[in-house]
């Protein structure tokens, strides 16, 4: 997978992709993340990429021309499966979306900034508008990093234990169950006995029931979604 991130603040992303799983994925050649400075695609002398909004509303707007020039240049080199715009008014990013996007070969992510981007850029180039939550950040860089991380870790060969990603929270619309490691008894706080039994069938049953209870308690919206799907399947 190749992810091209377009931003007017590239240094914000310098360190994020240089560590841990994301770094190893790139070293293995499994994933490639390329950050593009939008300012290199402007024709203005002082590298301006934003301007005042027509109509006089507050806040600056990213101009369509440098976005056009950057995306057009990238598309001249390869085909892209998706051009994603990170924006608070986009569709909320979830695990199912991550699963789907992780199958793509090439992706462009455009980071919003200031008051957003010229609507004409959205209409002409964007295939998916994505939000990571109902709140506003200073720019789309952190959101782009979140999406990139979620996609890359799903690619086969990235995680040392590939089953780990399949048992994460939200993969089956449930939160992940509680997990424990050594020691079995820490200051009187004891690991559930069933997890030490070696009985895989009973352990799996405990994990499902624990995940179900945690989801019901912490995310009733997900619990309701799961039970509806569960009932619809006749289980």
UniProtKB/Swiss-Prot annotation:
Cell compartments where the protein resides: Cytoplasm
GO biological process: tRNA N1-guanine methylation
InterPro entries recorded: Alpha/beta_knot_MTases, tRNA_m1G_MeTrfase_C_sf, tRNA_m1G_MeTrfase_TrmD, tRNA_m1G_MTases_N, tRNA_MeTrfase_TRMD/TRM10
Superkingdom to which the source organism belongs: Bacteria
This enzyme's EC code(s): 2.1.1.228
GO molecular function, one term: tRNA (guanine(37)-N1)-methyltransferase activity
Residues holding S-adenosyl-L-methionine: 112, 132-137
Catalysed conversion reaction: guanosine(37) in tRNA + S-adenosyl-L-methionine = N(1)-methylguanosine(37) in tRNA + S-adenosyl-L-homocysteine + H(+)
Cellular component terms (Gene Ontology): cytosol
A Pfam family per the record: tRNA_m1G_MT
Keyword Transferase set for record: yes
Keywords: Cytoplasm, Methyltransferase, S-adenosyl-L-methionine, Transferase, tRNA processing
The UniProt record lists the keyword Nucleus: no
UniProt family annotation: Belongs to the RNA methyltransferase TrmD family.
Subunit structure comment from the entry: Homodimer.
Described purpose of this protein according to its UniProt entry: Specifically methylates guanosine-37 in various tRNAs.
PANTHER family: TRNA (GUANINE-N(1)-)-METHYLTRANSFERASE (PTHR46417:SF1)
Protein name according to UniProt: tRNA (guanine-N(1)-)-methyltransferase
Organism in which the protein naturally occurs: Cytophaga hutchinsonii (strain ATCC 33406 / DSM 1761 / CIP 103989 / NBRC 15051 / NCIMB 9469 / D465)
């Amino acid at each position: 997978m190749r992810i091209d991130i377009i931003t007017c603040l590239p240094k914000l992303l310098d360190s994020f992709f240089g560590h841990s799983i994301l770094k190893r994925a790139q070293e293995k050649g499994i994933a490639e993340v390329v950050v593009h400075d939008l300012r290199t695609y402007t024709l203005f002398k002082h590298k301006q990429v934003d301007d005042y909004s027509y109509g006089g509303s507050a806040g600056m707007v990213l101009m369509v021309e440098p976005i056009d020039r950057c995306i057009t240049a990238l598309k001249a080199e390869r085909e892209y499966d998706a051009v994603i715009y990170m924006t608070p008014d986009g569709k909320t990013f979830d695990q199912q979306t991550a699963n789907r996007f992780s199958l793509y070969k090439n992706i462009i992510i455009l980071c919003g900034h200031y008051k957003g981007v010229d609507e004409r850029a959205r209409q002409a180039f964007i295939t998916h508008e994505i939000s990571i939550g109902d709140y506003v950040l200073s720019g789309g860089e952190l959101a782009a990093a979140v999406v990139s991380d979620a996609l890359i870790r799903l690619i086969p060969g990235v995680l040392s234990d590939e089953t780990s990603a399949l048992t994460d929270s939200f993969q089956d619309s449930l939160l992940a169950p509680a997990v424990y490691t050594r020691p079995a008894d820490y200051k009187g706080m004891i690991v559930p006995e069933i997890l030490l039994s070696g009985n895989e069938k009973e352990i799996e049953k405990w994990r499902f029931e624990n995940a179900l209870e945690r989801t019901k308690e912490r995310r009733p919206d997900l619990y309701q979604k799961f039970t509806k799907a569960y009932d619809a399947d006749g289980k």
